[in-house]
Amino acid sequence: TGSGPLLPPIKGLMDNIDKEGGNVYSILGMINHINDFPEDLEGKKIAVIGGGAVGLDVVEFFAARKADISIVEMMDQIGRDLDPVTKNDMKCQMKTHGVHQLTQTALQEVKEHSFLVKGSDGSYELPFDYGFVCLGMRAKGQLYPQLLDAFADDDVEILNIGDSQRARRIIDGTMEGRNILYHLTQRGYLD
C-alpha cells in the first residue's frame, strides 16, 4: 500500500535504476542510500529528471553539498505544482547554488553515467556522477481488494486512504488524516 515511484517505459530506465552499486536512483533509492552520499560533492555532477516537488527536494539536498546540479523538466517551468512561498524559495536556492535548469526538455534514455535528453535545441547527453529520476509517484493499492475480501463477513468498514488511493502531496495526506481522526472522534472511537 502507499505509493511508489512512477517509472515510465523509457529506454534503459529499468536496467539502471536503483541497482546495487549503480548511479541512477529513484526517490526511494535515494532515501535508502541517503547516508552513502558524501557531505562534500564539490566537482561532482548531479542530474535530476523531474522538476516537481520530489525533484526539487533532491536538488535542495545536493545543493547544500556543493554539487554541480542540473534539473530537467518537460513542462515550461520548474516547480509548477508548488505553493508560491516554496516555489519562490526554491527559485532563490537554485539561483544561489547555480543549478542548471532545463525546461521543455524530456528524458529519452537512461544510461549508467548519463541521461539522453531532448529539448528544443535537439538531443544531447547529460553526464552525471549521480542521476535521479523523479517523475512523480503512483498509487500502490494492491492490498485493498485483499482487505475487502478478508473482512467481507465482518462488521468492519475498510477505507482506502492516503497514497494507496491516489498519490498526492503531503498536505493532502495530512488533511485526510485529520478528517479521519475527526470522524473517529465524532463516532466515539477516540477520546
Q: Where would I find each of the regions flagged by the language model?
A:
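Glycine-rich dinucleotide-binding loop and its adjacent helix/turn
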Residues: S3-R65, D154-R169
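A conserved short coil-to-beta-strand element within the FAD-binding core of flavoproteins
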Residues: G4-I10, T103-S114
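FAD-binding beta-loop-beta segment adjacent to the flavin cofactor pocket
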Residues: M137-L159, R168
